[in-house]
């Protein structure tokens, strides 16, 4: 994916999410690695794709290793948004072995999860054949919505609403309580705050 077309990912938000993930996994310390791996041992390794995928999550993985230990060297061997085949190299890491072991699972979690979303999205876009846009929903992992929606864009999809606050989408429960689809649409248009030009959309089950 050309740099000019790469989706934007808020660096402040990304840093916050990575810190939260590391706190969740490491807590006060990696007890096993501290007790088992010699302090002076150095290591290196290469992350490789285990199957065909669209790569997403490199920025998160890089920050994981940097936060765990600034001495770790992370070198990207593939581009964010690139199609990779099984066995293709993603990145190379070198430095203190303890730190590599402590950081690897969190980094892999970001890469695997976001690449999975990007790959599935890219496959959906290909099947659509340009006849329609492929958009996401609010059915996201709590706390990871922004990152997951970023992965959708990496895969060539489009974002729909970020939350309940930035779009009007009338679903079955809404129009049933409003007295019908027409009544719900009219009410939504009438009650738009200060005439805000938000599109009013209705969820459908058939076309």
Can you describe what each PLM-predicted range is?
Residues 2-205:
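Acidic/glycine-rich phosphate/pyrophosphate-binding loops and surrounding catalytic core
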């Amino acid at each position: 994916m050309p740099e000019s077309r790469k989706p934007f990912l808020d660096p402040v938000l990304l840093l916050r999410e990575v810190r939260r993930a590391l706190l969740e996994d490491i807590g006060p310390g990696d007890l096993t690695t501290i007790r088992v791996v010699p302090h002076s041992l150095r290591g290196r390794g290469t992350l490789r794709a285990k199957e065909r995928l669209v790569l997403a999550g490199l920025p998160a993985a890089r920050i994981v290793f940097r936060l765990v230990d600034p001495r770790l060297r992370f070198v990207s061997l593939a581009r964010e948004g690139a199609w990779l085949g099984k066995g293709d190299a993603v990145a190379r890491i070198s430095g203190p072995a303890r730190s590599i072991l402590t950081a690897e699972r969190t980094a892999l979690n970001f890469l695997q999860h976001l690449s999975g979303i990007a790959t599935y999205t890219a496959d959906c876009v290909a099947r659509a054949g340009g006849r329609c846009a492929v958009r996401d929903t609010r059915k996201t992992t709590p706390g990871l919505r922004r990152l997951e929606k970023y992965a959708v864009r990496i895969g060539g999809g489009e974002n729909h609403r970020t939350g309940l606050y930035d779009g009007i989408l009338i679903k079955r429960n809404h129009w049933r309580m409003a007295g019908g689809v027409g009544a719900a649409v009219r009410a939504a248009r009438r009650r738009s705050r200060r005439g805000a030009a938000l599109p009013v959309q209705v969820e459908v089950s058939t076309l």
